[in-house]
Regions:
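Short, basic, alpha-helical segments at the C-terminal edge of helix-turn-helix-like DNA-binding modules
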Residues: 68-82
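Short helix-to-turn junction characteristic of helix-turn-helix DNA-binding domains
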Residues: 31-35
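Short alpha-helical "recognition helix" segments of helix-turn-helix
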Residues: 40-45
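Short, Lys/Arg-enriched N-terminal segment that forms or immediately precedes the first helix
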Residues: 3-18
Length: 88
Protein backbone atom coordinates (compact mmCIF):
# COMPACT_ATOMS: atom_id res chain seq x y z
CA UNK A 1 0.00 0.00 0.00
CA UNK A 2 2.91 2.35 0.58
CA UNK A 3 3.61 2.29 -3.16
CA UNK A 4 -0.05 2.59 -4.09
CA UNK A 5 -0.64 5.99 -2.45
CA UNK A 6 1.72 9.00 -2.52
CA UNK A 7 1.79 9.43 1.27
CA UNK A 8 2.44 12.81 2.85
CA UNK A 9 1.40 14.29 6.19
CA UNK A 10 -1.87 15.76 4.86
CA UNK A 11 -3.00 12.53 3.20
CA UNK A 12 -1.94 10.43 6.19
CA UNK A 13 -3.79 12.56 8.77
CA UNK A 14 -6.90 12.79 6.56
CA UNK A 15 -7.00 9.02 6.20
CA UNK A 16 -6.43 8.36 9.90
CA UNK A 17 -9.25 10.75 10.83
CA UNK A 18 -11.75 9.49 8.25
CA UNK A 19 -11.08 5.77 8.68
CA UNK A 20 -11.08 5.82 12.49
CA UNK A 21 -8.01 3.60 12.60
CA UNK A 22 -7.18 1.65 15.73
CA UNK A 23 -3.80 2.23 17.41
CA UNK A 24 -2.45 -1.00 15.89
CA UNK A 25 -3.65 -0.03 12.41
CA UNK A 26 -2.17 3.45 12.73
CA UNK A 27 1.17 2.08 13.95
CA UNK A 28 1.33 -0.48 11.12
CA UNK A 29 0.52 2.21 8.55
CA UNK A 30 3.07 4.69 9.88
CA UNK A 31 5.84 2.10 10.10
CA UNK A 32 5.09 0.84 6.56
CA UNK A 33 5.41 4.41 5.30
CA UNK A 34 8.74 4.73 7.14
CA UNK A 35 9.95 1.67 5.24
CA UNK A 36 9.74 -1.14 7.79
CA UNK A 37 9.25 -4.62 6.35
CA UNK A 38 6.40 -6.84 7.50
CA UNK A 39 8.92 -9.00 9.37
CA UNK A 40 10.37 -5.92 11.12
CA UNK A 41 6.90 -4.76 12.11
CA UNK A 42 6.03 -8.18 13.50
CA UNK A 43 9.25 -8.34 15.54
CA UNK A 44 9.21 -4.80 16.89
CA UNK A 45 5.46 -4.60 17.55
CA UNK A 46 5.25 -8.08 19.12
CA UNK A 47 2.84 -9.48 16.54
CA UNK A 48 2.91 -12.40 14.19
CA UNK A 49 3.56 -11.85 10.49
CA UNK A 50 0.04 -13.07 9.72
CA UNK A 51 -1.42 -10.50 12.15
CA UNK A 52 0.51 -7.71 10.44
CA UNK A 53 -0.70 -8.91 7.04
CA UNK A 54 -4.28 -9.10 8.31
CA UNK A 55 -4.06 -5.52 9.60
CA UNK A 56 -2.58 -4.31 6.29
CA UNK A 57 -5.48 -5.94 4.44
CA UNK A 58 -7.94 -4.21 6.79
CA UNK A 59 -6.20 -0.84 6.23
CA UNK A 60 -6.47 -1.24 2.45
CA UNK A 61 -10.16 -2.03 2.73
CA UNK A 62 -10.75 1.00 4.95
CA UNK A 63 -8.80 3.23 2.55
CA UNK A 64 -10.94 2.11 -0.38
CA UNK A 65 -14.11 2.76 1.65
CA UNK A 66 -13.22 6.30 2.81
CA UNK A 67 -11.35 7.54 -0.27
CA UNK A 68 -14.60 8.37 -2.08
CA UNK A 69 -15.67 10.73 0.73
CA UNK A 70 -12.51 12.84 0.69
CA UNK A 71 -11.29 15.49 -1.73
CA UNK A 72 -7.75 14.99 -0.40
CA UNK A 73 -7.26 11.22 -0.66
CA UNK A 74 -6.10 10.03 -4.10
CA UNK A 75 -7.36 6.75 -5.56
CA UNK A 76 -5.16 3.80 -4.67
CA UNK A 77 -3.20 2.34 -7.58
CA UNK A 78 -4.52 -1.12 -8.19
CA UNK A 79 -2.48 -2.57 -11.03
CA UNK A 80 1.14 -3.49 -11.58
CA UNK A 81 1.05 -1.44 -14.79
CA UNK A 82 0.21 1.77 -12.89
CA UNK A 83 3.00 1.15 -10.41
CA UNK A 84 5.46 0.29 -13.21
CA UNK A 85 4.73 3.57 -14.99
CA UNK A 86 5.57 5.52 -11.83
CA UNK A 87 8.90 3.75 -11.42
CA UNK A 88 10.04 4.04 -15.06
Amino acid sequence: MTNQVPWNKIILEEFINLALLTKDEEMILRTRIYGWTVREQADRLNMSVSSVNRIIKRIKKKYDEVEKYSAVLPPRKSSEKEMYLDKN
